[in-house]
């Protein structure tokens, strides 16, 4: 981008000097005079082990605010005041708006709602049950949170409809009104950009290790994740199973709200239970609600931040009650790539009081031990948490 004379901004949540010292590609970008660095390092986290909470929240706030400000500046010379007002352009102090939103979310009534809902999900999962969310405009927010749960807490990932071997994911999201191909495009705001790469192309790229059996990541494979209104027997294959409609307060005032709820009720007939959850002020009834008067804006930034924080809090709080957090560390991490393996080693080092080197050896001893386990056991036991349990108190 810099070589094409674009203005380049690099945003991250680590101390700049740590990145410069240890990661070559980061140092090159940080030291490039054409790059504007935005270091959003927020210090130690109350609950650590994933970037899904404080780090991405601060990035969403800063990047979202920048986009809304830019949109305002670009459109002001073009649109009338009435048109700008209709698009919810206004002067916003994003720092104060975010602080006010946090205070609203952590108020007594909303905290109780979060606690009650977390206990509800915990009870479902303790009985080996499944939760399927139904959403419209919040589909992306929910899909992001639910898919992140898999590597963060070593849960079963989303599975395709023709996969008869893998267990269903604990949670899933669907749109009650649209079929799957349309839902993917609606959620992304464009057609999905999938890869139709064959073995020859992987060899050309020097990836000989996977060329013999290249990953299938084309559009047909994507559409096998049934996030639309098609019936998916896997979502009711275990009991208890629950359907949960999640809407923002703003959505409940739209003309299509009744159609959504009717479609949700029709889809939910296949489930044992159904619940509704509204985030934001609304005059509609719901089983669970987070009450707060969210300021509107072109991208509805504060609403999306509140939805994100609500979902993050629910999923993380549920995993705490499920025993997948040690102290304040998300210790049931999956080590499916090098980044997560490094994270696991650092978790073991911190919690067990081992050096990084000894923690690395301890984790790999566990992985060697796990070779004797069945595939089902490998998927259900976190090697990081197992290593922590084995080494706690020994040092």
Predicted ranges, named:
Residues 1-395:
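Conserved N-terminal alpha-helical segment that immediately precedes and caps sugar-phosphate-binding
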């Amino acid at each position: 981008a810099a070589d094409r004379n674009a203005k380049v901004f690099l945003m991250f949540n680590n101390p700049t000097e740590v990145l410069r010292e240890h990661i070559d590609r980061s140092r090159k970008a940080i030291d490039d005079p054409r790059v504007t660095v935005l270091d959003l390092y927020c210090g130690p986290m109350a609950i650590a082990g994933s970037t899904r909470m404080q780090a991405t929240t601060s990035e969403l706030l800063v990047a979202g605010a920048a986009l809304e400000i830019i949109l305002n500046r670009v459109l002001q010379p073009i649109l009338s005041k009435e048109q700008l007002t209709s698009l919810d352009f206004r002067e916003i102090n994003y720092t104060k708006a975010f602080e006010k939103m946090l205070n609203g979310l952590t108020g007594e009534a909303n905290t109780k709602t979060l606690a009650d809902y977390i206990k509800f999900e915990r009870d479902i999962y303790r009985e080996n049950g499944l939760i399927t969310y139904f959403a419209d405009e919040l589909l992306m927010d929910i899909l992001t949170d639910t898919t992140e749960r898999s590597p963060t807490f070593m849960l079963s990932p989303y599975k395709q409809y023709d996969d008869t071997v893998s267990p269903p994911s604990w949670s899933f999201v669907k749109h009650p009104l649209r079929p799957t191909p349309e839902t993917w495009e609606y959620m992304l705001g464009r057609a999905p950009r999938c890869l139709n790469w064959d073995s020859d192309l992987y060899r050309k790229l020097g990836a000989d290790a996977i060329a013999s059996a290249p990953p299938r990541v084309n559009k047909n494979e994507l559409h096998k994740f049934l996030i639309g209104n098609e019936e998916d027997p896997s979502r009711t294959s275990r009991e208890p199973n629950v359907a949960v409609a999640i809407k923002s307060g703003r959505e409940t005032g739209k003309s299509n709200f009744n159609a959504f709820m009717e479609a949700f009720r029709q889809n939910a007939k296949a489930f044992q239970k159904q619940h509704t959850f509204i985030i934001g002020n609304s005059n509609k009834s719901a089983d669970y609600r987070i009450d707060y008067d969210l300021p509107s804006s072109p991208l509805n930034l504060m609403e999306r931040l509140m939805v994100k924080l609500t979902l993050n809090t629910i999923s993380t709080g549920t995993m705490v009650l499920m025993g997948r957090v040690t102290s304040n560390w998300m210790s049931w991490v999956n080590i499916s790539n090098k980044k997560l393996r490094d994270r696991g080693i650092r978790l073991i080092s911190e919690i067990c009081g081992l050096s990084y080197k000894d923690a690395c050896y301890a984790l790999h001893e566990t992985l060697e031990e796990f070779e004797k386990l069945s595939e089902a056991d490998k998927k259900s036991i976190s090697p990081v948490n197992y290593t922590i349990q084995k080494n706690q108190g020994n040092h």
